[in-house]
């Protein structure tokens, strides 16, 4: 009986430690973020976690087209929301599958945290949108050079999460597992296909942020017609 009690105490202790470790220490959206450069043009998902609205059979030719529609205007201590138009698309079942599209809006409410947005279908009110954080972004050259601080706004890759990575997993932390409005973990690139070196360093960088990279699935981009 004492052995069983001791085992339960140990399990509870480990659970508490794991829970306390997520989100990882220092986990935050990117500082010094240039939203005008990031939310402009096409991004390609090269790895991501499957989510309810984009399951494994839709991880083909995934793209996100961004256009910044309004910028922040502040008057008398009140700021107008920044709005981003987002057009997502993916092929279903394979690179030659039918194209599935979704029109979304992104809203940035805090001009002092420009890398944190809320994203959702255009037909929904913004208070129902889910979190979207740009955790890090930079150039391929910076990444390949092994830098840990990324200062350029020549954004060629990005690590994105559905907000805080507050759910402990066997391999680290993930955002909002099981919560529709706070799901997702993506690796984005301006090119549909990247070198093995870029992929390895990008995955390693995401892991260094405390994210569970074992949850990432590859997104097929070779052979796609967008």
PLM feature segments, named:
Residues 15-226:
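A beta-rich soluble binding module of mature secreted/lumenal proteins
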Residues 2-19:
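Cleavable N-terminal signal peptides of Sec/SRP-targeted secreted and luminal proteins
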């Amino acid at each position: 009986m004492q052995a069983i009690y001791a085992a339960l105490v140990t399990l509870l202790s480990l659970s508490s430690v794991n829970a306390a470790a997520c989100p990882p220490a220092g986990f935050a959206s990117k500082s010094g973020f240039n939203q005008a450069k990031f939310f402009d043009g096409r991004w390609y998902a090269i790895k991501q976690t499957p989510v309810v609205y984009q399951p494994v059979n839709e991880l083909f030719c995934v793209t996100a087209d961004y256009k910044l529609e309004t910028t922040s205007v502040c008057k008398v201590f009140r700021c107008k929301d920044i709005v981003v138009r987002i057009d997502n698309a993916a092929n279903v079942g394979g690179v030659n599958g039918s194209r599935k599209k979704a029109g979304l809006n992104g809203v940035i409410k805090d001009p002092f945290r420009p890398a944190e947005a809320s994203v959702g279908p255009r037909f929904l009110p913004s208070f129902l949108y889910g979190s979207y954080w740009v955790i890090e972004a930079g150039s391929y050259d910076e990444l390949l050079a092994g830098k840990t601080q990324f200062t350029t706004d020549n954004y060629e890759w990005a690590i994105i999460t559905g907000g805080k990575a507050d759910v402990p997993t066997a391999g680290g932390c993930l955002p909002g597992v099981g919560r529709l409005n706070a799901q997702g973990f993506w690796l984005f690139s301006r090119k549909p296909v990247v070198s093995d070196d870029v992929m390895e360093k990008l995955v390693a960088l995401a892991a260094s942020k405390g994210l569970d990279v074992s949850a990432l699935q590859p997104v097929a981009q070779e052979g796609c017609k967008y």
